[in-house]
Each structure stands twice: as structure tokens, then as C-alpha cells.
Amino acid sequence: MNPSRNLFLIGPTGAGKTSVGRRLAAHYGLAFVDLDHEIERRTGTDVATVFAVEGEVGFRRRESTLLAELSAGDGVLLVTGAGAVLAADNRALLATRGYVLWLQAGIEQQLERLAHDHQRPLLAGTDRRTRLEAMATIREPLYSETADLALPATHGIATTCSQAIALIDRHWQRHSLPTPSPAA
């Protein structure tokens, strides 16, 4: 059990991490950060362009640096990109700096949710099913290794959020954030 002040969401692309994460952050009073969106904000361009210019290695380097920075504090709900778990250092940071919920999604569900999304660089120009299956084979053991809890995200966002809250409340030994001292 990881007593923590942070909550991290991991899982495959199309699992609903960002949508669920926003609601969970509001529920628990945590600052919401989406790692991919933060990379876009800081670079001034989208993830696909970062991949095109810097390659996956450059993107993963940025991702790791930003994860280390943003997970260092307290009171954050951070949504990782689907591939953040590929780096052992990232997995270690997640495991030691927060409570980790793995939102699980099957291939059919991912294909349905990503049908109109053409901004995913690792899914561009390939047979999406084959690519998603290959990524799942590599990443699912890493998600399992890193996660404190796993939740199949097989329903809509509202239902998944309700299920996540019930699951988290049963298992997360959350440390309270420090209360400010009264002014003297």
C-alpha cells in the first residue's frame, strides 16, 4: 500500500485516463495534470510534431524529465501517456511518489474510442489493431508491475469514475495535505 498525497493514472491509449482523471482530481481536491498536454503546452506544439521532430527517444526523454518534475510535489492527480511506463525510472517514480491506478481497456474498446483520433503518432499509418496488440503485449506487464490498483474501464466515463472512487476509497491510505499555519 502506497500512502501518498498524489494519485497517478496509467493505462493504454483510449482508456479514458484524461476524462476520468479530471473528475477524480475534482473529487479528491487534487491539481489535475495531463503529462502529454503539459508537454504540448511547454513545447508549443502537439505530441505528433514532437515525435516527428525529436523521434520517440526525444519525446520519451521529455516525458521522463517532466514526470520527475511534476510528481515531486504533493496534491496532484497526474495522467501519464500510455508509454510512460516503458522507462524503468518512470515506473519507479510513479511507484514511490503516488498511488497508481491502472485504467484497463481492451483492444476493441480502444479501436472504438480512437476511431476518429488521428493524432496518435504511434498509431499513424499502420494497422491499428496490430499496433495496439503489440503495444499491449509490451506494456500490460509494466502497468501491472507499477499499479497499486487496476480497474477495467469498460463503461462510460461517469460509471468508470464512480467505480474508481469506490475502489480508491477502499484502498488508498491518503496522507492529508499539510494545513497552513495561522498567521501570527
Task: Label every model-predicted segment.
Residues 20:
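Hydrophobic positions on the alpha1 helix immediately C-terminal to the Walker A/P-loop
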Residues 12:
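P-loop (Walker A) phosphate-binding loop of NTP-binding proteins
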Residues 9:
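Hydrophobic anchor at the beta1->P-loop junction of P-loop NTPases
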Residues 82-84, 106-108, 156:
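Short glycine-rich anion-binding loops that position phosphate/pyrophosphate groups of nucleotides
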Residues 17:
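Conserved lysine of the Walker
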Residues 2-3, 23, 27, 73, ...:
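NTP-dependent small-molecule kinase module
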Residues 96-141:
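A glycine- and Lys/Arg-enriched "phosphate-lid" helix/loop adjacent to the NTP-binding pocket
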Residues 34-95, 119-120, 133, 142:
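ATP-dependent small-molecule kinase phosphotransfer cores
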